[in-house]
Curated annotation (Swiss-Prot):
Comment, domains: EAR motifs are involved in transcriptional repressor activity.
UniProt KW keywords: DNA-binding, Nucleus, Phosphoprotein, Plant defense, Repeat, Repressor, Transcription, Transcription regulation
Effect of S175A: Normal flg22-induced phosphorylation by MPK4
The protein, known as: Trihelix transcription factor ASR3
Record localization: Nucleus
Keyword Phosphoprotein: yes
Subunit structure: Homodimer. Interacts directly with MPK4.
Organism: Arabidopsis thaliana
Gene: ASR3
């Protein structure tokens, strides 16, 4: 179902997006905070898209975390809020979560009602607002938003590397070099009993030190090269990860645009059908009124004729 695909199973949150913040109880001024602005259709569409992107990131992060043991990930609603702000919707994580909760609850009610109706005349989209409220349905719900939520498709999660990988630090390499050189420093002080012994030992130590430095340079160079290679690989992986995210966002945006075009076309057809039905109803109403008027005139004429006949007899 579309409801399961979009992950609408969220806990209910008291209050909608238009509910004002709690007053300053116990304060001296008693001033209430400003009322939050209403969500526009475009903001809701960005919210839906941001939730899809955030859920994709969560799935990819979990897969990468199981494989590589990455660090903590950004909370889902904080990620949704960041996506919204990048696309011009300045809403916080709490606002996004509350608006989605209300949107999910209203969608479930409408979806359940539409699945139970037997005729198109009982559809939620044909009802007046007062009739909707009598049937405990949302007073208003945007048709385009409903169609996107109902027919939305989330792309499959692709396991990728997490951004939690940290590059190898230069301090670690330097500390390894210091540890390797420390034995030489400890053994570099010769103990001589005579000038000849000192000279011989210095020559021997110089030869040994040269050989040791040659041997040590080889693994050190290998370690440095290996560290730089791993850093480059991680940088390339992070770069490819960012490019994949951008491509996915572009693909989602194009998909949303195509869905909007299809929805607008369907809404136009539905509106044309509704106008045709209304015109037909008005035409039938006019014909009925005309028939009633003609019948009333005929009855009045007969009554006048009867009164005239009675007057003539008198």
């Amino acid at each position: 179902m579309a409801l399961e695909q979009l992950g609408l199973g969220v806990s209910a949150v008291d209050g909608g997006e238009n509910s004002s913040a709690p007053s300053n109880d116990g304060g001296d001024d008693g001033v209430k905070t400003a009322r939050l602005p209403r969500w526009t259709r475009q903001e809701i569409l960005v919210l839906i898209q941001g939730k899809r992107v955030a859920e994709n990131r969560v799935r990819r992060g979990r897969a990468a975390g199981m494989a590589l043991g990455s660090g903590q990930m950004e909370p889902k609603w904080a990620s949704v809020s960041s996506y919204c702000k990048r696309h011009g919707v300045n809403r916080g994580p709490v606002q996004c979560r509350k608006r989605w909760s209300n949107l999910a609850g209203d969608y479930k009610k409408i979806k359940e009602w539409e699945s139970q109706i037997k005729e198109e005349t009982e559809s939620y989209w044909v009802m007046r607002n007062d009739v909707r409220r009598e049937k405990k349905l949302p007073g208003f719900f945007d048709k385009e938003v409903y169609d996107i939520v109902d027919g939305g498709v989330i792309p499959p999660a692709v396991p990728v590397l997490s951004l939690g990988l940290a590059p190898a630090s230069d301090e670690g390499l330097l500390s390894d070099l210091d540890r390797r050189e420390s034995p030489e420093k400890l053994n570099s002080t010769p103990v001589a009993k005579s000038v000849t012994d000192v000279i011989d030992k210095e020559k021997q130590e110089a030869c040994v030190a040269d050989q040791g430095r040659v041997k040590e340079k080889q693994p050190e160079a290998a370690n440095v090269e290996g560290g730089s290679t791993s850093q480059e690989e991680r940088k390339r992986k992070r770069t490819s990860f960012g490019e994949k995210e951008e491509e996915e966002e572009e693909g989602e945006t194009k998909k949303m645009q195509n869905q909007l075009i299809e929805i607008l076309e369907r809404n136009g057809q539905l509106l044309a059908a509704q106008l045709e039905v209304q015109n037909l109803n008005l035409k039938l109403d006019r014909e009925q009124r005309k028939d009633h008027g003609d019948s009333l005139v005929a009855v009045l004429n007969k009554l006048a004729d009867a009164v005239a006949k009675i007057a003539d007899k008198m």
